């Protein structure tokens, strides 16, 4: 059976990544591509690396016949996404890649994103889209909210440990290095090559990064009490990848065994041999997550390192993984390509 999909926001990085992945999918066809400011253009003119694919001409959202669409990927900016999704057909399956439906509490959304939520009915309906932990809910969902790329990385490092009670919940430090593509394709002065290359800086210091809202929501729900991690992201002058170094108080061997049990049957999560450290090089362009555990020299402390590709597993790959479940397809369809190396 072939499923027809539409991609809204197809001219951004996550939209292009969705097209790349879906082009290898055995049973999904791209029926419509929307990009309001580039309507009428061909994808080959927006992203020349997709020139070999036969794709629909970019159009406006209101030009799409959603009666012909089985599932819609919404890769629009937050705030815009909720406005658009609220107007889409009520029976349409949707995977949203923005931040608009990740937080269940409307007050939390307003706190982190600065605006009241304009689609409260859809917000309450949405299922959080971290596939490995919400698989059953996603299968029956109409609207799935993709996670933040940083939020996904941190959760792969910490969710099983919090659930198993093998770490001190008040002693968690999360240090994350993020590729520049995570900031999107819009022109910004601080992301110009001359401003960014050959440098490295922290940002959103002091607990102000918006993805902390997801950490607070998810970790506290698992623990049954408030959990607050100390999180600082850093911007790297690279195109793809996130590397999270997590410092926790707990027995390193118990932590390793917890991961081994939690991820034993996960097709996209690779637990490295004890003491080995992941690299973003080894997950680039893939839907895989690599996790490493090392004992710290300080007794009773451990270091957990997680690497993933922010555009693939952190966004578009996760979105396709969720779409597979929603459409009744094999979860891994279109996603088992090997990472790009070197």
From Swiss-Prot:
Q: What GO biological process terms are annotated to this protein in UniProt? A: L-arginine biosynthetic process
Origin organism of this chain? Ruegeria sp. (strain TM1040) (Silicibacter sp.)
| Pathway annotation from the record | Amino-acid biosynthesis; L-arginine biosynthesis; N(2)-acetyl-L-ornithine from L-glutamate: step 3/4
Q: What are the record's GO terms for cellular component?
A: cytoplasm
Determine if NADP is one of this entry's keywords. Answer: yes
Enumerate the catalysed reactions: N-acetyl-L-glutamate 5-semialdehyde + phosphate + NADP(+) = N-acetyl-L-glutamyl 5-phosphate + NADPH + H(+)
Xref: InterPro entries: AGPR_type-1, NAD(P)-bd_dom_sf, NAGSA_dehydrogenase, Semialdehyde_DH_NAD-bd
Classification via Gene3D superfamilies: Dihydrodipicolinate Reductase, domain 2 (3.30.360.10), NAD(P)-binding Rossmann-like Domain (3.40.50.720)
> What are the subcellular locations of this protein?
Cytoplasm
- What NCBIfam families does this protein's entry cite? argC
Q: Where is the active site?
A: 149
Instruction: Provide the family line.
Output: Belongs to the NAGSA dehydrogenase family. Type 1 subfamily.
Q: Which SMART domains match?
A: Semialdhyde_dh (SM00859)
Record-given protein name: N-acetyl-gamma-glutamyl-phosphate reductase
Q: Does the keyword Thylakoid apply?
A: no
**What exactly does this protein do?**
Catalyzes the NADPH-dependent reduction of N-acetyl-5-glutamyl phosphate to yield N-acetyl-L-glutamate 5-semialdehyde.
Q: What class of enzyme is it?
A: oxidoreductase
Quote the SUPFAM superfamilies the UniProt record gives. Glyceraldehyde-3-phosphate dehydrogenase-like, C-terminal domain, NAD(P)-binding Rossmann-fold domains
Entry's Gene Ontology molecular function annotations: N-acetyl-gamma-glutamyl-phosphate reductase activity; NAD binding; NADP+ binding
